């Protein structure tokens, strides 16, 4: 952020795109701002299909440079700002994974980081019943609350994959909590 030459910062991940309508809205907003930062909604594309039922994941991405205080978080870093936050109307496109070969390596990497954060936070010891509860909670959230099943095969794949992702994180936590660890035997 220190190297940015303009007064505003637009933070994007490599798999996010700014459509023309959003670009115009951003230009108009920074020309006459009402807030120090703005959230942008993401149009989720997973396995080449828009997921209507992913929800409206808003992310804080347009920030007046002087309002940015710091970044927080190890895995999904978030900007901490001073001032008010507004919402932009148009969506950015989030081109999530195109195939399973892209998705699995990221999940393996992130699950290690998430498990370490849970271990560092002194998560209660993992037991068999916790795995079942975690997986059922994830299923309920993705399938029932979000309604991803309505997005057809791609929705079901995402529901099952998110359950798998949660399982990996907590299985890694279980391994780390074991005494002696398997690597020491």
Predicted regions and their residues:
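Aromatic, loop-rich ligand-recognition surfaces of beta-strand-rich domains
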Residues: 16
